[in-house]
Amino acid sequence: VIGQWQRKTTDNCTGEAFGEVFLAMTDNLSSKCFARTDNCTGEAFGELFLAMTDNLSSKCFAPTDNEQLTTDKFMQNQIVFITGASSGIGAACAKIFAHAGAKLILAARRWERLQQLADSLDIAADKIHLLQLDVCDRLAVESTINNLPPSWSNIDILINNAGLSRGLDKLYQGDFHDWEEMIDTNIKGLLYLTRYVVPGMVERNHGHVINIGSIAGHQTYPGGNVYCGTKAAVKAISEGLKQDLLGTPVRVTSVDPGMVETEFSQVRFHGDTERAKKVYEGVKPLTPDDVADVIFFCATRASHVNINEVILMPVDQA
């Protein structure tokens, strides 16, 4: 009960009220369970205990208005722009923000997957806007942002989620195309969206940029050379943007997960499913929903609170 409810400071929760409930509870318990009769069964005791906790929670642990504001009202009709939304963490974010009442701009290259996601969401048609967008294409990003319908142009939360990894080659044997794809998506794509969205946030004195980094931006691993470099860049860009926005109410957060079971490894190994499966052998990885929960938590703090960085990993990873 205490873990789920905040004590409400109203006349309901007085010492007298608490005492009355407690005395009634003990009277009932003593009359049923401390007399040498057949009344004191486990079932009877359980019923009394449940009744007791119901009385206590209704009188002394009612949810506060602030709690309801955070979960039910704060996100209502906030415009949330999610890149890489067609699968994985992006799709999980779409689900949790839709459930909270947000309006969603979902962007990805795979149009059919976006449509499938939209169909699966319990959300009104006027609260979702789909964009087929390659974040690596700066001119396409510029045109997309500048030509959003007026009712969608005031973006409140930007989730820079689009990203990928390619290969595990040694640096001196690396594939140039793989390097360029990682740099263009993970760094340039994030920069393009940030550059075209954040000025509006500053002008409106409201907004939140959430960049999806990685534990790879904090520690390198064999074969991760360029990918780790791109995620280290995301970490530095997030810190630099936060400094640039000091004096404004616009917030910046970097969420840096460890192993997450998505299509990430399949993409890394160019569709080699068997090789991708081996990445998670002996490990219970994070799920996209695990990461989306953390992102949603960061986005729903009080406006004066900025969570700069979150590192989350599965218990099986160190």
Language-model-derived ranges and their functions:
Residues 214:
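Residue(s) in the substrate-gating loop at a strand-loop-helix junction
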Residues 132-143, 176:
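The beta1-alpha1 cofactor-binding region of Rossmann-like NAD(H)/NADP(H)-dependent oxidoreductases
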Residues 194, 230:
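Active-site helix of classical SDR
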Residues 86-87:
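Conserved glycine-rich cofactor-binding loop
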Residues 102-116:
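Conserved glycine-rich Rossmann-like NAD(P)H-binding loop of the short-chain dehydrogenase/reductase
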Residues 169-171, 175-183:
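Substrate-binding pocket helix/loop in short-chain dehydrogenase/reductase
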Residues 250, 254-255, 274-318:
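C-terminal helical subdomain
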